[in-house]
A protein has these predicted regions:
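Alpha-helix termini
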Residues: 47-48, 128, 144-151, 199-208
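Glycine- and charge-rich intrinsically disordered segments
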Residues: 1-16, 150-151, 255
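Conserved beta-sheet core of the metallophosphoesterase superfamily
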Residues: 158-252
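Charge-rich, low-complexity terminal tails
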Residues: 103-115, 238-259
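Beta-strand-turn-beta hairpins that frame and shape the catalytic cleft
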Residues: 12-23, 139-159, 210-213
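Core catalytic region of metal-dependent phosphoesterases/phosphodiesterases
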Residues: 8-132
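Active-site neighborhood of phospho(di)ester-bond hydrolases with catalytic His/Asp-centered motifs
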Residues: 24-27, 54-60, 98-105, 133, ...
Length: 259
């Protein structure tokens, strides 16, 4: 069975990397008639060609429309079984780039809820990355580069990754985990870079300081239409984000881009 969410993922990247670019990929929805194959293939190719690029997968890899789900089974371009085959191949192709995988509602609220199976975990197992899967929340420690040239010490960044998140004016899901540097979520298809901050008491030095947390949602790989337009939802931006983690000093940069 898959590892508990409470077991953090330790991702030790090569020490010769000056930085690592992290892409949070989610709401891909392969099998949906709205799946944007060109967008997916363009980004996949760019990531594979860049040694500094890595991936965190944040759920809803496939559409997985089944009886009694909100999605339309009859408009799917591939059956759920074919969608799993596609996901397995993508995970295999990107296995050396993937740092973690969490499931989304199109996996856990459908197949898992109806029959107790975990389709995305199955895909990870077959692709040889089962240890990187977490069912709901992934806590990940990413080590990159050499801290100030010290070959024995890497720069570490701690993150929390989950498909759904609360994002209110005075509260965010990132608030309930101390010590994180970044938080990534998806689900609502709304691309946004919305950093948060909290005050922290340093009990050793007896001072209060502000800790910044990068909070990122990378939208989706869906075109407009279908369920969204039928329910009067507005079109969502195609913008995506990459999080750059530097290896020689504790510094993060979130950059937006279009494909």
């Amino acid at each position: 069975m898959f590892l508990s969410d409470e077991i953090p993922i330790l991702a030790n990247l090569p020490v010769d990397r000056e930085y690592a670019d992290i892409y949070f990929l989610h709401d891909i929805h392969f099998g949906s008639e709205l799946f944007d194959e060109k967008k997916w293939e363009t980004l996949k190719s760019a990531i594979l060609s860049d040694e500094n690029s890595y991936i965190c997968i944040v759920g809803d890899v496939f559409e997985n429309a089944i009886p009694n789900s909100k999605s339309d089974m009859f408009s799917q371009t591939h059956s759920p079984a074919e969608q799993k085959d596609w996901a397995i191949q993508q995970l295999k192709d990107l296995s050396h780039k993937i740092l973690e995988v969490v499931s989304g509602n199109h996996e856990s609220n459908r197949t898992t809820k109806v029959c107790g199976l975990f389709p995305l975990y199955d895909c990870c197992l077959i692709a040889g990355i089962g240890e990187k899967y977490r069912e709901t929340i992934a806590f990940i420690d990413i080590a990159v580069g050499r801290y100030r040239g010290n070959s024995h010490k890497q720069m570490h960044y701690f993150g929390q990754i989950q498909h759904k998140a609360k994002d209110l004016r005075s509260y965010h899901s990132s608030d309930y985990t101390d010590g994180i540097d970044f938080f990534a979520s998806g689900h609502d298809h709304e691309a946004k870079d919305k950093p948060r901050a909290k005050l922290v008491f340093d009990k050793h030095n007896k001072v209060i300081y502000k800790r910044n947390v990068e909070c990122i949602n990378c939208g989706s790989f869906c075109k407009f239409g279908g369920y969204g337009s039928k329910n009067a939802y507005r079109p969502q931006s195609d913008k995506m984000y990459r999080l750059r983690l530097y290896g020689n000093e504790k510094r993060m940069e979130t950059t937006g881009f279009y494909l």
